């Protein structure tokens, strides 16, 4: 029998269940904990293999040759997607902007650090219309330079080169972003089921922008920031100003940076709405096979940039859309504007009685002048008093505007690349910027053994040492590479006052550790971590194992002047399942909050499991509570948490919200108490499988070794200087 013998239309694959998405476990059981977020981006997904190191590969790139090729690309118009005014700069800026602009400060997720705009949902967001064309224009360059340049780097570089090619002196650029190879599973983009659903669905009160659901930073599903036509598509520049301010603040931009990015972003390029958006094909992810990843196909394009339809808004913002100049301010403030409609029916603003010489030329016919436009967000720059004042300052000093924009653009495109020690390439700026969370280099030459001896003799308890080290390190976020133990910012505002850090206990511990650091030449950051290591070693010894926790000296101590306190507020833990604590009751379940923290820390499922079990038996719960401390040998690094969790002689009885008793199944006597963050390791089938491994009789030593490895991973998560 061969394939020709198959009956037509009868599938040779049973049910298609392997290759076509069926009903997933989370669809059958929506309350199931989604542990997949801990195992995304596995090396098995990457075509480059587990031994490939992009950050090493990019260092061998011919940077100048690449930049020349990208400059040439800007004016090499292609028939299949003609360049506006013969220049792709505006398109490439939008690609870079929308790649980086999905970043949000609240959890550090989104952003351009992974090349995620290549995949769903971002590749098919309404606001990202026709950016598939921009990526295809970059393909010949990516093909030429291969694995020496990632898509993530190339996409963001394209915007910077575009600005350079149009006359802006940029602030710099760093390489070093590694591509992912599948869509992210950990990013919450919103609960809406429809693209561009009304803003009301993510606000408690849409008239109060600060009531937008956290961690979101865009006003509607499928937008990067705000609706350019106005709040819910209804023009009101002052309401738009309020939404612009909130959305940009949620990605760590102040008013001046926001105004600079808005005005500078619209100094070049144009919007596209010269046609019927209803005739466009589906976006890339939902389009036909033969379109080969292209979406928003326009049957009326006919090789003419003039007929393109993207946002539905039509026109350029300035007289010279391929030139970095002050034309945006000249038109916005030099004319009165009135509300009108684009050919696609979108709301936009047009100037009243504009002079012909101030009108931009047609994108494909330089002999023809056409009307410029402004969006509601642009009118907000004029009508909002604070933004207006900033614009007046820019208008009075072009050099100041250009420098402010260049720095804001650099921040936008590098916000999630991490500290300056990670920067790569000849154009990486050497200046320390406060939003990079700078940390001075620490000493590596002190006597580590002597420091550990002083800590051991200090009188601090095991719990105090381990808890303080954990609290210092747990702020790390793999999403934007912020936080962590390096810098010892736990001793500075705002961290020293966070409820999750137990300020009274923290100050007691610091009052002991800081003199040790001063006396030995070690940094406070190193001493805090060493204290945690001493505690872990003591706990292991109490369990019968002599181990040495790995340690690399060299952490530095940041100062208050190096710390943007407001920006660090977003790193405050409102829950920490590893220390069995929540600041208050939340709609989100404790186990989901635990999972989120584990993902941000870069932990796998087994690492999360072994860390929590070890933290429990060492008695490190917030406030000294006994929930989840399933042992009578507190302070010994035993596998008792898992042994008792999986012991069928025990019964689990709910005693109120997020409170459980562990009772003897026969007598009913209460043996332990627990929270959901404890019992999920026996309830969830995957976590129970991990727990059973660590509960086995032969797992005592493995448990200790695995705990130490996971502990060290967290302590060193921000040691980019060791890479």
Curated annotation (Swiss-Prot):
Names of required cofactors: heme b
Record has Metal-binding as a keyword: yes
Enzyme class name: oxidoreductase
Residues given in the record as heme b binding sites: 266
HAMAP family the UniProt entry points to: Catal_peroxid
Physiological role: Bifunctional enzyme with both catalase and broad-spectrum peroxidase activity.
Family label: Belongs to the peroxidase family. Peroxidase/catalase subfamily.
Name of the protein this chain belongs to: Catalase-peroxidase
Annotated organism of origin: Hyphomonas neptunium (strain ATCC 15444)
Gene from which the chain derives: katG
